[in-house]
């Protein structure tokens, strides 16, 4: 009888121990759940980002209205879709230049820091030019160190058109084309017209 009584007595204590253990485990897990949550700081960061986006978006919307009403000669530009920060531009080869008759497409990407940082502008159409490389990168001072918040995308497009009329071999991205421009202008112009006909018409 005493043995059975012991078994009966032992049984609740064992189950009670496991119940306490489960409670202890659940209590210990509570802080872990709380530790997973702290991401509310991101609200402050995102609010600053939202303020930047609001400032830049207003400026871009203003420029879009201006360039739609009064586009630069031989140029057009506007958002690709719903994203105000991603534009596509079209430049017609300037009359009298080796790019005349060509239609050149460019991508324009604005950052949330615009207009305090320049837009990124790249050619999508291949072009034979000493200041524009095969990736479409443009060597233009106002897109780098000489950028100013007073500049607009219309002025940038005008500067690119000027670069198509008069390249700058003293500051080339493609050294071989710059050398050819200075030493064999006739061959340079022939190649530029050939590329324009092949890739931009």
Swiss-Prot record:
Compositionally skewed regions (Low complexity) per UniProt: 46-55
Oxidoreductase recorded as keyword: no
Keyword ATP-binding: yes
Pfam family, any one: UQ_con
Keywords recorded for this protein, A-Z: Acetylation, ATP-binding, Nucleotide-binding, Phosphoprotein, Transferase, Ubl conjugation, Ubl conjugation pathway
First-tier enzyme category under EC: transferase
Catalytic activity: S-ubiquitinyl-[E1 ubiquitin-activating enzyme]-L-cysteine + [E2 ubiquitin-conjugating enzyme]-L-cysteine = [E1 ubiquitin-activating enzyme]-L-cysteine + S-ubiquitinyl-[E2 ubiquitin-conjugating enzyme]-L-cysteine
Domain UBC core, residue spans: 55-201
Purpose: Accepts ubiquitin from the E1 complex and catalyzes its covalent attachment to other proteins. In vitro catalyzes 'Lys-11'- and 'Lys-48'-, as well as 'Lys-63'-linked polyubiquitination. Catalyzes the ISGylation of influenza A virus NS1 protein.
Name listed for the protein in its UniProt record: Ubiquitin-conjugating enzyme E2 E2
